Each structure stands twice: as structure tokens, then as C-alpha cells.
A protein has these predicted regions:
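Alpha-helical protein-protein interaction elements
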Residues: 1, 25, 42, 48, ...
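N-terminal secretory targeting modules
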Residues: 1-75, 81-82, 86, 91, ...
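Short, flexible loop segments at the rims of nucleotide/cofactor-binding pockets, characterized by
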Residues: 48-53, 103-107, 192-193
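Soluble periplasmic/extracytoplasmic beta-strand elements of cell-envelope proteins
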Residues: 74, 99-100
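Short hydrophobic segments within beta-strands
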Residues: 76-77, 169
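Catalytic nucleophile serine of serine hydrolases
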Residues: 79, 102
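Short substrate-entry loop that stabilizes the transition state in hydrolases
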Residues: 83, 107-108
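Alpha-helical cap/lid subdomain in secreted, periplasmic
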Residues: 90-97, 106, 112-264
């Protein structure tokens, strides 16, 4: 119990400091007490299980080995992958031997820690890695492009060492088009500068080409002439809506097909 109150105190103190800084408005107002409780609970969970290994532990334990001819694919990622199996978006590739292992809010160091349990142990033919946007935003603290690239390279190399082919998916564009319920702009590009996203995508494309992987370019298909996430593809300037996933799905299928046909 004392630990819980200590976490609450830490969250309150952090919130007080953050309130003095200009912040990106949230999409909708929330009850302060409920928000504080939620943040304290998340903080406690992160203390116990920072990489969220427990999230898929049970599901992994009941996942049977792939059949001889099964082209099993695991999707590793953050909220964009995590939300893909939401019924609102038509489900996660119905009828396909694809496994969703996305976790909302995660960064590449967290994914790297759980990569063996959530990808390698499931024995897929291929992994699709969509990661990096939360690193750029600093979800788990300050970082550098070099550190993000190192984590992505480590996941790539771990997969290859275990006979798993790799698709590197580009980080999606973001936009500043959306507004909160009280009309305030949601400025996504402040936390996720487009030039950093572009640099990371350029690196992934080059790394995949040099090491026998496939680069999946969501960015070009989803960006407008300003380089922003097209307004009709998102409700919050960050996450795809149904139309967004409808753009992404066939691109993912094309990349998977290409990767499975490759000899690397």
C-alpha cells in the first residue's frame, strides 16, 4: 500500500512539473481523479513488468506450433498494431495465420526484451516490425535515433539468427489537423517531428535492403502533399481509423508475399 501511495505522489509531482510546460492538448477532457488513478496503476504495472511480458504470456503458452506448410506471421509493434484486431476495423486479417503481438505505447527497447517470447518462441516464418513512433515521442524517456536504430537492428538480427524473415514497416506520418472537443488543435508534430520520422524510415529502408529484409512503405501511401497523415485516415492525427487500416492491409500482404518468396 505504501508503494502505491508513493507512486501516486510521484505521478502528482510529475504532473505538477509538466503543467508548467506548454503541452499538446488531449483529444477529450477526462476526470482528474480517474486519470490520476489510471496513471498510478500504469506506473505500478511498469515497475513490475516494464516490457509487458505478461501481456501475451498466456496466449503464447496456448499457441500451438505451426504446421509444416503454415506461413505463420507475427506482427510486432505498438498501439497501431495492437488496435488492428479491433472489430471496428474489420478484424486482424481474418483467415490468415497471422498473430498480433502489438502493445499500446511501447518503444523499441521494450519490444526487444519481449522479442524472444512474443516472436521467436512462436516459430513464425516471418515477422513484421512496426515500431519507433513512441521512441521519437519519448514514451519511455529521452532517446536518440541511433538508439532506436540499434534496437531495430537487434530485433532484425535476432529474427534472422532464428530463420525468421523480416519486414521493416515504416513509421506512419502524423498530422496536426485534428482538434479536441473544445476546439484546441492537437499538435502531433511537436512530439513526433516529421524530420525524425523521415530519417528513421530512410534508415530502415537501407538496412532492410542491405540485410535481406523487406521494407514496407506505409508512409508514402498515407501521407498527403504536406507529409502529414491524410486527414481521412485518422481521427486523432496519430492512429489509423478503419480507412487507414484499409490502406495498410493490402500493403502488408504485398510485403509478406515478397518476403516469403525471397531467398534470404
Amino acid at each position: 500500500m505504501n508503494r502505491f501511495f508513493a507512486i501516486v505522489y510521484l505521478v502528482v509531482a510529475t504532473a505538477a512539473i509538466a503543467s508548467a510546460q506548454p503541452a499538446t492538448p488531449t483529444p477529450s477532457p477526462v476526470d482528474p481523479c480517474a486519470a490520476l488513478t489510471t496513471r498510478a496503476t500504469r506506473a505500478e504495472t511498469r515497475l513490475r513488468d516494464w516490457p509487458a511480458l505478461d501481456r501475451y504470456r498466456e496466449a503464447n503458452s496456448t499457441t500451438t506450433p505451426p504446421t509444416k506448410d503454415e506461413n505463420r506471421v507475427v506482427f510486432m509493434g505498438d498501439s497501431i498494431t495492437d488496435s488492428w484486431d479491433d472489430p471496428r476495423y474489420g478484424g486482424f486479417f481474418p483467415g490468415k495465420p497471422y498473430i498480433d503481438r502489438g502493445i499500446s505505447g511501447q518503444t523499441t527497447p521494450q519490444m526487444l526484451i519481449r522479442f524472444r517470447a512474443d516472436v521467436i518462441a512462436l516459430k513464425p516464418r516471418l515477422v513484421v516490425i512496426l515500431a519507433g513512433t513512441n521512441d521519437v515521442a519519448g514514451n519511455t524517456g529521452p532517446t536518440t535515433l541511433q538508439a532506436i536504430e540499434d534496437n531495430l537492428a537487434s530485433m532484425f538480427d535476432l529474427a534472422h539468427a532464428n530463420g525468421i524473415r523480416v519486414v521493416f514497416a515504416s513509421v506512419l506520418p502524423v498530422s496536426d489537423y485534428e482538434k479536441t472537443t473544445d476546439g484546441q488543435p492537437i499538435v502531433r508534430t511537436k512530439q513526433r517531428p516529421p524530420e525524425q520520422i523521415a530519417a528513421l524510415n530512410t534508415w530502415m529502408k537501407k538496412y532492410a535492403a542491405m540485410h535481406g529484409g523487406i521494407y514496407l512503405d506505409y508512409f508514402s501511401a498515407m501521407a498527403d502533399d504536406k507529409g502529414f497523415l491524410r486527414e481521412e485516415l485518422s481521427e486523432d492525427g496519430l492512429h489509423p481509423n478503419q480507412k487507414g487500416y484499409e490502406v495498410m492491409a493490402p500493403l502488408a500482404e504485398q510485403a509478406i508475399t515478397a518476403a516469403l518468396k525471397s531467398r534470404s
